Amino acid sequence: MHTERQKHIRNFSIVAHIDHGKSTLADRLIEKTGTLTEREMNSQVLDNMELEKERGITIKSQAIRLIYKRKDGGEYVLNLIDTPGHVDFNYEVSRSLAACEGAILVVDATQGIQAQTLANCYLAMEHDLEILPVINKIDLPSARAEEVKEEIEDIIGIEASEAPLVSAKTGLNIEQVLEAIVDKIPSPQGDENAPLKALIFDSNYDSYKGVVCHIRVKEGNIKPGDEIKLMATGKIYEVTETGIFVPNFMPRAELRAGDVGYFTASIKNVRDARVGDTVTGAKNQAKEPLKGYRPVISMVYSGIYPVDGAKYGELKEALEKLQVNDAALNFEPETSVALGFGFRCGFLGLLHMDVIQERVEREFNLDIITTAPSVIYKIGKTDGTVVELTNPTNMPPVSEIKYMEEPIVKASIITPSEYVGAVMELAQNRRGVFRDMQYIETTRVSLNYDIPLNEIIYNFFDVLKSRTRGYASLDYELKGYKSAKLVRLDVLLNGDMVDALSMIVPEERAYDRGRGIAEKLKGIIPRQLFEIPIQAAVGGKVIARETVKAMRKDVLAKCYGGDISRKRKLLEKQKEGKKRMRQVGTVEIPQEAFMAILKTEE
């Protein structure tokens, strides 16, 4: 079923490695089609969160409708669905791609193919999308367009001889990209009279309308007043508004098969409108949902505590507000002896965690302390039950543990060939299991490893970058669980265990890690008037110790000359005081201490 209207629609997204110029290319397409006036154009239109602009990354998917008039007078609707490029947001990317028929693959002419270029490209291929390579940054003197074309053909195996050579920065050859979109990307198919079937590829919360669902209609149509059903949750709502993105919401009478747009239906929470869910009619239902939906799984957990305990309520509100727009964030209250009341939060990955923490501080003006991130371990107990452990302090006693499993990821690292040795050494140090390696071209290699997620969280990326002078790129996905010998490493300050500093480490590494942490903390914890022992312990046995020396307060300053016994009396008194102080004194732990645990040197 292919109507005349559908022949003039193209739905596509742009995929690329970080910094290859995806958002800039989107800006040029928007500008070229005259979608926004010059006054409304600001750079990176689709990255509208302050943080996105600052870090130069795309966090949320966005969509925009472009109208392109060809020279022969034909008018086409191009729906551009922008995707996040970072590996944490992999699932969001896959849902955005499922809403399209084609993808533009942007490759930097100076850098060639990188790990996420490949990862995103394979994702697009899994969705049977028509892939359109575009080579960007050809205005740079170091551009090597022809070699990059060969690379694309050899590695990805798609025809690249006619790939447009563009410069998104200067706007060179952007017209060619628009022509290629119309010529190469297939138009949507789908029966407008069939029962409604639409894919939610994103949702966001609007304080007036409730949840706004961004959808691609696959079959049927949707208009205000319709009763719809969300298939994953089974809930039924009445549609209050439908419309399109220009990039702001613009109401329309209806959306039909092939369209990309949004609808609102007084949905209260983003969790009810899950990304990847299928929307269908409440009465005239589709037989089965669109495939590929899965609930979002948190990979990394971290504790977030207010610096001022009285702000607990405000922190809760802040997290609730962020959660309304971010279904991947989950949190539950937890208490720590050291930090008081706070929340254990689950995130998609390290970048997601960073972004949320920064947004809490920025948008809600809260000072927070965050504990070192941890992954989910599975523990089989002797009584036959299996528990999931997200917080190291909740680890059951050793006598109750039968086995422990940790998450393993499939990591692919692309690096210049002269650094292969350094990268392999790093992966082996991190308990990586070598799978295979392929040469991409004579100078670049792709290495595949299975590595515990625990090791990746632990500054893997930073070390990888420094060992390869910033040239290597990394992509990973969860593979499954594998049993391992793990122990809990506790940190004691002044004889008291600080629960927020506990971490789970492989048994054979406990000693090194313990020593590293003790040394690191020694440099961070401020000196007090009494000395503070820092101890690392496993199962009650101390394995490393450092001491923060006491500051000396000169109690003899007011004695000029005079009798030695007078001085001795003052010194004895000071000694007594220090002893008492050590018993009741508490040690202030600065925020850096929690993060420093992650950064102990290799």
UniProtKB/Swiss-Prot annotation:
Q: From the Swiss-Prot or TrEMBL record, what is one GO molecular function term?
A: ribosome binding
Which terms under GO biological process does the entry name?
positive regulation of translation
Q: What is its main location?
A: membrane
Highest taxon of source: Bacteria
Alphabetical list of SMART domains matching this protein: EFG_C
Q: Which GO terms describe its cellular component?
A: plasma membrane
Q: Please report the stretch or stretches of sequence annotated as the tr-type G domain.
A: 7-189
Q: Which family does it belong to?
A: Belongs to the TRAFAC class translation factor GTPase superfamily. Classic translation factor GTPase family. LepA subfamily.
Q: What is this protein's function?
A: Required for accurate and efficient protein synthesis under certain stress conditions. May act as a fidelity factor of the translation reaction, by catalyzing a one-codon backward translocation of tRNAs on improperly translocated ribosomes. Back-translocation proceeds from a post-translocation (POST) complex to a pre-translocation (PRE) complex, thus giving elongation factor G a second chance to translocate the tRNAs correctly. Binds to ribosomes in a GTP-dependent manner.
Q: What is this protein called?
A: Elongation factor 4
